[in-house]
């Protein structure tokens, strides 16, 4: 049970994505009261990976082999950056 006003944000994990595929992550799991927040995500290099947000879900699309930073900004003022690595082969859950 979550006690109102308690808790702390968790670290959003780095991700692996295969070229031409997508991987989803529910951001609400990583921020206190996450289901009540809004999220904005940006990719440092959209030629490597693009990112979109639908509700609490972040979708990362692998464009070409390489690595880039994805920045997650949250309506409560929190911000985290992760590394997304795109490889020719990775499975659909982000693991190699």
Model regions: which residues?
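Extracytoplasmic soluble-region selector
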Residues: 1-96
